[in-house]
From Swiss-Prot:
Gene name as annotated: ncs2
Family named by the database record: Belongs to the CTU2/NCS2 family.
Keyword match Ribonucleoprotein: no
GO terms, biological process: protein urmylation; tRNA thio-modification; tRNA wobble position uridine thiolation; tRNA wobble uridine modification
Protein name: Cytoplasmic tRNA 2-thiolation protein 2
Length: 366
């Protein structure tokens, strides 16, 4: 049988030559870029038009930038929206984008990305940028030292004479297993981002998670006992912290994001690509988060629609009625049922930890 002939014109605009295969349609570069930009544009519409919110005054949104391809591409897309908003004299008030970079070298042993931060400021002048070390969580969240001390248990002592960086590193070293370490780091990063957003009086946070990251996060949360947190960790809407969480790239495949990034050379100096997982790493030495990311990455290339359906199914979930106005875990912030309320110390009712956080405690993790 003769092979299927490729179209000589873009299947969208019918003018330019096709350059990409986009969801079974051969499209040109301009249509490819337009299609992907429309995804976050649609999800940012309510902020652009100020629907159900004040029409005057600032509407600040925080974008955490990790220098990864997804968060960098999201920043590029939202900056294009800001350019379009500013070009209209009588257009809607729109929104502001505040970019927060938690310096990667203070989280893991990687070199500082000084040139990337400077290049991001130069490339996206309509956004304001802030860079903070991981240990600045002590300044932004005054209660975190008490929470960490009780969370780590009686064998851990928080030495306040040490620098904030040393105090945080000692606490992180007290966590034993790979899954617990990854889980605790994500909670601390989330607390830092939320605390900074509140300090800057932001209305919400826009996260640069792609469909694969959201699918992996959904599966990992369920495996770690954080299924109740899926409703706000991967879904658009109000979080337990009083801030709106938004995931504008939730309908975009990771492979599409990578291709998009290659079309804009100015992004190359900002993006720090993840190292491919080592084949020699034993499964038992990987965290649940790493296992799920590895699984979704390999299967997502074969079946991208399946991974997208995972996040779409999760977005249909609703918080249980017991979470409304109920107790919140002092560590991760998730709502708890009375059955899973676990106190931080014997007989101490001041701090409560949810079941999932209790599993990651040094004395209980296994």
């Amino acid at each position: 049988m003769p092979g299927k002939e490729l179209p000589d014109r873009c299947m969208n605009c019918h003018e330019a030559e096709p350059a990409f295969l986009l969801r079974e349609r051969h499209v040109c570069q301009e249509c490819y870029i337009r299609f992907l930009n429309f995804k976050p544009f649609r999800r940012m519409e309510r902020y652009r038009l100020r629907r159900n919110m004040p029409q005057t005054g600032p509407c600040k949104l925080l974008l955490p930038l990790s220098y990864g391809v997804s968060s960098t591409v999201l920043l590029h897309m939202l900056h294009r929206q800001l350019e379009a908003l500013r070009s209209k004299k009588h257009g809607p008030a729109g929104f502001e984008i505040l970019v927060l970079v938690v310096e990667p070298s203070t989280i893991s042993p990687v070199p500082p990305h000084e040139e990337g931060f400077a290049l991001a400021q130069q490339t996206f002048p309509l956004c304001s940028f802030t860079r903070l070390p991981f240990h600045s969580i002590f300044e932004l969240d005054p209660d975190v030292h008490q929470i960490m001390s009780q969370y780590a248990g009686e064998h851990f002592t928080d030495d306040t004479s040490l620098s904030d960086e040393e105090r945080l590193n000692r606490f992180r070293r007290s966590i034993t297993t790979a899954t617990s370490k990854s889980d605790v780091d994500q909670i601390l990063l989330n607390k830092l981002v939320v605390a900074f957003a509140k300090k800057m009086e932001c209305r919400g946070i826009v996260w640069g998670d792609s469909d694969s990251k959201l699918a992996a996060k959904t599966l990992a949360n369920v495996a770690k006992g954080r299924g109740s947190a899926v409703t706000w960790q991967v879904c658009d809407g109000m979080s337990p912290f009083g801030l709106e969480f938004n995931f504008p790239l939730r309908d975009v495949f990771t492979a599409e994001i990578r291709t998009y990034a290659t079309l804009f050379p100015e992004l190359a100096g900002i993006i720090v690509h993840d190292e491919p997982p080592s084949e020699n790493t034993l499964t038992k030495n990987l965290s649940i988060d790493e296992l799920m990311i590895r699984y979704v990455s390999t299967q997502g290339e074969k079946y991208p629609g399946v991974m997208l359906n995972v996040t779409r199914t999760a977005s249909k979930l609703q918080s249980s009625g017991t979470s409304i106005g109920g107790l919140q875990c002092n560590f991760c912030g998730a709502f708890m049922t009375t059955n899973e309320n676990i106190t931080g110390e014997q007989g101490n009712e001041q701090l409560q930890f949810c079941y999932a956080c209790a599993r990651s405690q040094p004395e209980l993790s296994c």
